[in-house]
Regions:
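Rhodanese-like catalytic fold shared by cysteine-dependent sulfurtransferases
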Residues: 1-40, 48-51, 59-88, 94-135
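Active-site flanking residues adjacent to catalytic metal/cofactor-binding acidic residues
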Residues: 54
């Protein structure tokens, strides 16, 4: 195997680059439709268009305080949402990983562009943004 690689180094490098490009293209097609938002950029999006905000936290956490007009939907129930592919949907939770998982599910369901709030509800609170519900 090593002899083949050394004797065909140009072929090996070309094949390696081709594999990298294919993997990169596939990753971009999956993740390219998911964008992170800062609290400030979320405010701009909310002011500019109709947005569905999905709070992935437990109902107790949601009731204690959530972003105004957010809907409390669990990660398991994301697939039950009726969406149009042009909808603007932003997911958030306690951390990014759950919000990213939800955004990936939405893209798989046909949504062209999904967003998630970077840093979750904690970044929203740290930036002194308004909450709805009991605090």
């Amino acid at each position: 195997m090593l002899d083949f690689i050394t004797n065909n180094i140009v072929l090996f490098i070309t094949l390696t680059i081709l594999i990298f490009l294919i993997v990169n293209l596939e990753m971009n097609s999956l993740f390219g439709s998911i964008k992170k938002l800062t609290p400030d950029s979320l405010i701009q999006l909310l002011n500019g268009s109709k947005v569905l905000l999905i709070d992935l936290r437990s109902s107790e956490e949601f009731n204690a305080g959530h972003i105004i007009n957010a809907k409390n939907i669990s990660l398991d129930d994301i697939e039950s949402i009726k969406i149009n592919k042009e909808d603007s949907i932003v997911t958030y939770g306690i951390n990014d990983s759950e919000a990213i998982k939800a955004a990936k599910k939405l893209v798989k369901l046909g949504l062209e562009q999904a967003y998630y709030l970077e840093g979750g509800i904690n970044s929203w609170i740290e930036n002194s943004m308004p909450l709805s519900g009991e605090k």
